[in-house]
Amino acid sequence: MAVPVVQAVQAVHLESDAFLVCLNHALSTEKEEVMGLCIGELNDDVRSESKFAHAGSDVCTVPEKVDSIRVVHIHSVIILRRSDKRKDRVEISPEQLSAASTEAERLAELTGRPMRVVGWYHSHPHITVWPSHVDVRTQAMYQMMDQGFVGLIFSCFIEDKNTKTGRVLYTCFQSVQAQKSSDYERIEIPVHVVPHVTIGKVCLESAVELPKILCQEEQDAYRRIHSLTHLDSVTKIHNGSVFTKNLCSQMSAVSGPLLQWLEDRLEQNQQHLRELQREKEELMAELRSLE
C-alpha cells in the first residue's frame, strides 16, 4: 500500500507583476540560466466544504469539513547577480540569501506584513520545464531550512513543433523523499497567477535593476579575463570587442524594450490622470449647480 505524500505547501499564488519580472529576467538571455529569489508570505488559508440541511421551512448551511491549506503568496522577486555563468545550472550563495532576508525584513517593516524569502526561481533556456536531479537536490537542501520553500522554473526559447511559434512554460515544485530510496523526487505545486491592475513599486524597482545587473555580470567576466597576464595584445583587443558587442546586444534586447515599456506605461498613467481630472471637474460643476 502506497504511503500518501504529505505536502508542506498546497498552492502558490504568484502576483502578476512579480510574474512579469521573472519572465523578463528569464527572456534576457538564452545562453545561460538565470536565477532569483521570491519574497512573500506563507499563510494557512481556510478551506471549508459545506452541505445544506433542512429544518422545517428553513434551509441552513451546516459545515461538513473545515481544514486549512498552506499557500505561498509571492509578492515580489529579487534578481540575483551571477558570479559564474553556466548554461545548465545556477548557484545561490549564502551571502545572497542573507541579503535577500535583509531586504524581506525591510519590506515587512514597510508593508506591516510578515514578508520573508519563500522560494527561488531560475530559467531553463531551450530545455524542458521539469527540474533536473540537481534542481531537485538543491530544492531539498532549501527545504531543510524552511519546509515552505518552493521552486519555480521558467522554460523559454522553445518552439512548438506544430505551430512553429515560441512558448514559455513555467512550473512550481518541491522535493520529497523517494520511497525505498535515499534520493529525492519532485512534487508539483499548483501555481496561480494573481492579476494586478498596476505594477508594484518593489517589482518596478526589480525590473529597472535588470539591465544594471546584466551589465555588472559582463563587466565582472571581462575584468576576470582581462586580468590574466599571459594574454597577448590581439587577444585582449578581441575580448574587448566581444565585451562591447555583448553590452550592445543587452541594450538592444533588454534596455531598449524596457525603456519603451516604461514610457508607454507613463503615457497611459498620464492619460488616466487627465481623464480623472476631467471627471473631477465635471462633478465639481454639477455640485456647484446644485447649490
UniProtKB/Swiss-Prot annotation:
Stored SUPFAM superfamilies: JAB1/MPN domain (SSF102712)
EC number(s) reported in the record: 3.4.19.-
Residues noted as binding Zn(2+) in the record, renumbered to the chain: 122, 124, 135
Cofactor notes: Binds 1 zinc ion per subunit.
GO biological process: cell division; cellular response to ionizing radiation; chromatin remodeling; DNA repair-dependent chromatin remodeling; double-strand break repair; mitotic G2 DNA damage checkpoint signaling; positive regulation of DNA repair; positive regulation of NLRP3 inflammasome complex assembly
Residue list for modification Phosphoserine: 233
Its job: Metalloprotease that specifically cleaves 'Lys-63'-linked polyubiquitin chains. Does not have activity toward 'Lys-48'-linked polyubiquitin chains. Component of the BRCA1-A complex, a complex that specifically recognizes 'Lys-63'-linked ubiquitinated histones H2A and H2AX at DNA lesions sites, leading to target the BRCA1-BARD1 heterodimer to sites of DNA damage at double-strand breaks (DSBs). In the BRCA1-A complex, it specifically removes 'Lys-63'-linked ubiquitin on histones H2A and H2AX, antagonizing the RNF8-dependent ubiquitination at double-strand breaks (DSBs).
Subunit annotation: Component of the ARISC complex, at least composed of UIMC1/RAP80, ABRAXAS1, BRCC3/BRCC36, BABAM2 and BABAM1/NBA1. Component of the BRCA1-A complex, at least composed of BRCA1, BARD1, UIMC1/RAP80, ABRAXAS1, BRCC3/BRCC36, BABAM2 and BABAM1/NBA1. In the BRCA1-A complex, interacts directly with ABRAXAS1 and BABAM2. Component of the BRISC complex, at least composed of ABRAXAS2, BRCC3/BRCC36, BABAM2 and BABAM1/NBA1. Identified in a complex with SHMT2 and the other subunits of the BRISC complex. In the BRISC complex, interacts directly with ABRAXAS2. Identified in a complex with ABRAXAS2 and NUMA1.
Listed name of the protein: Lys-63-specific deubiquitinase BRCC36
Protein species of origin: Rattus norvegicus (Rat)
Phylogenetic lineage: Eukaryota, Metazoa, Chordata, Craniata, Vertebrata
Annotated gene: Brcc3
